[in-house]
Structure formats: C-alpha cells, structure tokens
Regions:
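N-terminal secretory signal peptides and thylakoid transit peptides that target proteins
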Residues: 1-20, 24-28
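Active-site- and interface-proximal helix/loop "cap" or "latch" segments in soluble metabolic
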Residues: 48-149
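Beta1/beta-strand and adjacent pyrophosphate-binding region of the FAD-binding site
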Residues: 168-183
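Glycine-rich FAD pyrophosphate-binding loop
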Residues: 195-212
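Conserved redox-cofactor binding core of oxidoreductases
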Residues: 259-362, 383-384, 443-446, 578-599
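Glycine-rich loop(s) and the adjacent beta-strand/alpha-helix scaffold that form part
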Residues: 359-361, 367-439, 655-657, 661-670
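An anion/pyrophosphate-binding glycine-rich loop and adjacent beta-alpha core
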Residues: 411-413, 420-560
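A glycine-rich dinucleotide-binding beta-alpha-beta segment and adjacent secondary-structure elements
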Residues: 566-651
C-alpha cells in the first residue's frame, strides 16, 4: 500500500528544507504531478546587497501534457541572461513546437508570468511553473517539489491504491454528484446536470477543459429528420456493431446509444444552436456517407448509417461552450484538482473520492451522496498499460494523435475500487503514422516522455495515408487489398517486416483521390483544396515523403535495394496491369480504388498506425453503472467515455463515423439521469 500521510509530507518538507525545497503537489486522474521540481546547476548562497538574484544557472521541471518539461535559466545579479526551454517530449505539432516562442516570452517578460502559446495551454503552464522554480532558486527562496501518486511501471501497470492518512486530508466538500474529468463526457454531463439544477462538482487535474472531439454519432436525430434522411434500420445497425466486435459487446449497452443518442443531440443542439452562440449543425449525409457502389459489390457489405453531426466550424469548441454554459448557471470546473482514490462504505457503495489540489498539494475529501461519474479518458498515453494490455496495437503504431494526458489513472482507480476491466484491447488506429525510411513501429526510448518511451513519428496523422493507393512491404511486395477500414491496414502490417509498409502513387493523385471517394475523416484529403499538395511539399522537405522522376529512383530513395528493389519495380508494373484491366485479380480491390503509377513525379512514404485513443474500459451496465468481477453493478459508480467498456472490443468500426464520441455524450447524460433519479 502506498501510504501518504501528514507525517510523511512533513518529513519530505523537513528534508527538502535543508536544500531550500518544500513539499508539494501530487498527480491525478490522467497525468503526473504538475508541480515544479528543481535542481541548481550552479550558483549558491544568498542575494548580495543591491542585487536581485544570486548569479548562476538554475533548472526547473514540471509535468506537461505528456512529458517532463524542463526550463534552464541563467541569471546575473540583476537580470536573466539566457533561457533554454525543453518541451521535446510534448505533442510534436503543439507543445514541442512551442519551445522557441516560450523561450522568447520568458526572456522578454523578466518573470515567469508569460502569455503562453495558444493551443498549448498545459505545456505553457508547465513552462511557467518550471520558470517559477528557477526564479525562486535565483532569489534564494524555497521551491516546490513534487510527490507523485503511483504511476505503475513496466512490470506492474496497475500499481497499488494509495493509502492516504486522515490527517493529510485538510478539506471536505459535500455534494450529490462528482464528475471526474472535464473532457467530452465530463463536460456534457456537467452541462446536463447544470441545466437540471443539480448539486454537483466537476474536477479536472489540468488547467483547462480537454480537447473537443467535434464529430459525434446520433441515430435518427432531429437534424437527420429535418434533412429528410430515412430512419436507420436499428436492428441491422445493432447486428453490424455486434459482428464488428465479434459478438463480445453487451448489445444492451450498444442499444443505449442507439435509442438515446437522438435525445442527446437535441440537448447539445439546444445549447450550441441557441443564443449567444447560434452555431450551425453539419450533418454528414448523401454521397459523403456512402462509399462508391462497387465497394459494396466487391467486398462484404458494410453499413454506413447517416449518423455523424458536428459543429466543427463553430467559433468555440463544444467543451468550451459547455464550460461557459455551466458558469452562466453558477457552476464552475474545479481545475487543478485530481482524483487520488475512490472511497466506499462497508457495503461496497462508492461514497465519493479523495482528490488533491495539484498546485499546493492539499488533499480534499469529496462526499457524493448520489454517485461518482468517471470520465477520465483511456490509457493511450501510458506505455506501461499499452504494452501489457494492447501488445498488438502498440507493436504496429508509429505515431500518436491521442490526448497525451490520457494515462489510465481513472481506470486504475476504478479497478482498485473493485471494478472490472474488459478483457480485450480496443485501440482506435488510423493508417496515417508517417515515418522516415528504416523506422520500425513500436516504442522508442524517450527520456522526457512518461514511462521513458514514445512512438517515433513526428506527425500526428498524415491524412492521405488512408487513401487506397498501392501499399507494399519492405521487400517490395503487395500484401493486401488497400481499400479497407482505417485499422485494417495497420493490423495487416503486423505480419510484415518492421510492422510498416510503403504507400506509392504518381502525379495524378488528385484525380485518384476524387475517384476513390473515401468517407469520414479521410475525406479531408479530397475536399480540402490543396491539402495533399501542401503536405507532400512539407513532408518531402522533412525527409518523410520521397519524390522521384523514375520508379527506379523512387525505389532507391525509399530504401529498396537488391532483390527487394527488383520486386518493388515488378510490383508497380503488375499494379499498372491490374489498373488497365480494371480488375484486381490479386486481392479483389474494387476497380474504383485502383490507380495507375505512370506519370512523374512519383511519390512514396512509409506508414504505420497513428494511435488516437484506447477504448478498452470498465465494464458497465446499460445504465452506465460500473460492474465488478462478478458482473454485478457497483452502487454509486458510473463511467462514460473512452474509459467505459462493454461496447468496443478488438477494434473501432470506423465506417460508422462518430460512434465513440456519440456514445460518450449519450452515456454522460444517461449516468447523470441515473444518479439524480431523473428516470
């Protein structure tokens, strides 16, 4: 048992005080501590008369969204003379890319209070906390260090529930409902609870609401009816989802989404489409919800129900709107407040939780008379859990597009309290993990990343990777029908060297993409003008896209040599023959998805999977109540979002756009209704 006591904190503080450091905050619900720690590289003593700082170089660290952020600052007696910001372990296109701007802001500000970088709020906050540590050291002041909740390790991803001494709990909140996590599920639940005037608190360990997933699936929504869309065959939809899950789902749980998602949309629309927002709903329908006819003839029939709606063109994302909405009704998100452990009574009922303020470290008991809703996300950002729970998904992944804060703490806390985790992994993999030649799938060492590991790709998602161009392995061999669901290509690559494959096309890619007419998010390559063209240019400059005037030259640039090069050239020739015949005799790809490779310049790239999220979660009832190992409901504990189970198994049916987020929002409302006795 991880004992965290008042005495323990005092011991830490006493020991730290000898080196000018005091005890501080813990981590919670999806990431490690956000408090800063420090180490003095040079410089010592006290501030001289007439001086502001003790000259020297000081280092501060703080937990960002996916890694430990480090700031190193050099001081003269009166000013900061140099700053180094290391955010290399953060999200590549956001926090990691913000280092130079954050460095410049620190140099110009003369303090740790800077504006930060838009889109990188959590990374910016971490940089400011690390800089505060440097300033404190340079002034000879005490510096906050961190104590972390159990994060698990490569041998034990679950870890042990912390044992928190009563004396360490210095604050108590009494409420009816506690919502843990201010993401898609948590914010929807909070908005619904606020509209109903319920007594609730919502806590979030980070400093802002989490990223909005704009697209969500609804069945027979009012928007679909307004557009004249025929009703969905619900029995067929249920059967198709169950088939996709190999029968491992709880069909009653799936039916909760099917039957109640329309009402969920009406609730969301009632806020987003009303003043002061007046946003317009977009419904995916018509040709955008349908693959070409020959894909339904040449392949097993797949169902594409008209269900996905979004407000992606709105000025503010949905989670921010929900935050403003609950604030207008007198509620607020308790930021910097993270889950430490759930609490239950002698009968096994969840009575609330213990949280910790991640800024100053004090513990809070939150009593919840009606229940706790966990909406903490999955475990995609936790390599310990990924490697043990989803070895196949981990082994075929080259890049990440997940929320790095999703480290599975909510799942672990639920299991500690007696909840059951679904037996099978369910990663959401996109065939868009762009990497350089010679790079294998799977983790690589990354000292600044959580768990010391990260995926090698620097591009979150290369959207054109989902286009059904020719794809070959490292021996130059074609090995599949490329016209598949997003994760199929990634799973197929598990049987190939390095678990990666190459995608090849020629200069006529624009005509090909239009004819392919892929749907869902892969359609962005088709209907955003110049998107693929600009990405080809950008990633060629970065050494991730190869461009050549001949197939032989392309083979060399892609890394094919010897017999593999000969095979690659022969494969391209064979593929052209199949295109000319308009019949794929090798793998049965529909004719509309074939393409010629004859017009220079020729392009090639290497791909693996891009991991969006994990959907292996806590088993739940149709009322979204967590279940124990005997499949009995746990009183007082409810779950939604990526950490909820009983729905997705093995994979995500990506041809049914928005299903995961639609389920998240629907279950969030369902859980609130159940806890509050509204149904």
């Amino acid at each position: 048992m991880n004992k965290i006591s008042r005495k323990g904190f005092l011991k830490i503080a006493a020991a730290a005080a000898m080196s000018g450091v005091t005890a501080g905050a813990l981590a919670a619900c999806e990431s490690a501590s956000s408090a800063a720690s420090s180490a003095v590289s040079s410089g010592a003593g006290s501030v001289a008369a007439g001086a502001t700082y003790i000259p020297g170089t000081y280092e501060g660290t703080a937990q960002g969204i996916s890694s430990t952020v480090k700031v190193t600052m050099t001081f003269s007696e009166t000013a900061v003379t140099d700053v180094v910001v290391d955010t290399s372990g953060e999200t590549a296109s956001y926090g990691a890319a913000a280092a130079d701007e954050l460095r410049q802001q620190l140099l110009e500000a003369g303090s740790a209070e800077i504006d930060g970088v838009s889109g990188s709020t959590i990374t910016s906050d971490a940089v400011m906390k690390a800089a505060q540590s440097c300033y404190a050291q340079a002034k000879g002041e005490a510096v906050v260090t961190s104590v972390q909740l159990p994060s698990g390790d490569e041998n034990d991803w679950l870890g042990t529930e912390p044992d928190i001494d009563e004396a360490a709990i210095t604050e108590t909140w009494d409420t009816d409902i506690v919502i843990v996590g201010a993401g898609n599920g948590g914010m929807c639940a909070a908005a619904y609870a606020a509209q109903k005037g319920l007594n609730f608190r919502i806590i979030e360990q980070n400093s802002a609401v989490m990223e909005t997933r704009h697209w969500y699936g609804t069945i027979d929504s009012s928007e679909a009816q307004k557009q004249g869309v025929p009703p969905v065959d619900r029995a067929e939809l249920l059967s198709e989802i169950s088939r996709s899950m190999g029968g491992r789902c709880d069909q009653r749980v799936v039916k909760t989404w099917i039957d109640e998602s329309a009402a969920m949309h009406d609730f969301v629309a009632g806020i987003l489409e009303s003043a002061p927002y007046n946003y317009t709903c977009n419904l995916t329908l018509g040709d955008e919800a349908k693959w070409p006819d020959d894909t339904q003839i040449s392949q097993t029939k797949l169902m594409f129900p008209v269900q996905q709606v979004d407000y992606s063109s709105a000025e503010k994302p949905r989670n921010v709107v929900f935050q403003e909405y609950i604030e207008s009704l007198g509620y607020a998100v308790d930021f910097h407040t993270g889950l430490a452990k759930l609490e239950k009574d002698g009968d096994g009922r969840i009575t609330g939780l213990i949280a910790q303020n991640t800024e100053d470290g004090h513990f809070i008991r939150i009593n919840a008379s009606q229940g706790v809703l966990l909406a903490c996300g999955g475990y995609a950002g936790n390599p310990y859990m990924m490697e043990k729970l989803d070895p196949l998904g981990t082994s075929v992944t080259t890049a990440c597009s997940y929320a790095p804060a999703d480290k599975g703490y909510g799942i672990r806390a639920a299991i500690w309290a007696g909840a059951h985790l679904d037996a099978e992994a369910a990663p959401v993999l996109f065939d868009r993990g762009l990497v350089a030649p010679g790079v294998d799938s799977g983790y690589v060492e990354s000292a600044s990343s959580f768990g010391g590991k990260a995926f090698p790709g620097t591009v979150g998602q290369y959207n054109p990777g989902s286009q059904p161009f020719l794809k070959v392995n490292r021996h130059g061999e074609r090995f599949m029908n490329e016209s598949q669901e997003y994760d199929n290509a990634s799973h197929a690559s598990f049987q190939q060297p390095g678990h990666v494959y190459a995608m090849i096309h020629d200069a006529n890619f624009r005509e090909d993409v239009d004819r392919f007419h892929t749907i869902g998010c892969s359609a962005l390559t088709r209907y955003i003008p110049g998107m693929m063209e600009s990405q080809l240019e950008q990633y060629e400059a970065e050494g991730l896209i190869m461009k050549a005037d001949t197939i032989e030259e392309l083979a060399d640039k892609m890394g094919f040599a010897g017999a593999d090069k000969d095979t690659f050239i022969a494969t391209v020739q064979r593929y052209n023959e199949l295109y000319d015949a308009q019949k794929d005799e090798d793998f049965g790809k529909p004719a509309s998805r074939l393409s010629a490779i004859r017009t220079a310049p020729f392009y090639g790239c290497w791909l693996g999977a891009s991991l969006l999220c994990s959907l292996q979660g806590i088993s739940i009832t149709p009322n979204c109540q967590a279940k124990d190992d005997r499949n009995e409901p746990i009183p007082g504990l409810y779950v939604t979002g990526d950490m909820s189970g009983s729905f997705f198994q093995n994979n995500y049916p990506c041809v049914m756009g928005g299903t995961a987020c639609g389920r998240t929002l629907t279950f969030a409302i369902k859980a609130i209704k159940q806890m509050a006795g509204l149904e």
